[in-house]
């Protein structure tokens, strides 16, 4: 199953303006591929960031529990509100 992750945060905790968050993000982002592999998640695209205080990623996992473990270990919830959209490829979703 594919999941679109929409992670939004306030300007106050944005890594561009908050040193504590920046330090955490700079430490964790290089570890993201190994966290994903360890938790059974495949990062399909992203994470992408933008000026709207939103981070977007597309991941794939056979188990929702694996995705939850990935999000906890990657600490996305410590500085974001995470919205998870279970998604299908368009061809499959149109059936």
Provide a role label for each language-model segment.
Residues 66-75:
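Short amphipathic alpha-helices in soluble, non-transmembrane regions
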Residues 40, 75-78:
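Glycine-centered loop/turn motif at secondary-structure junctions
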Residues 77-89:
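Conserved short beta-strand edge segments in small beta-sheet-based binding/regulatory domains
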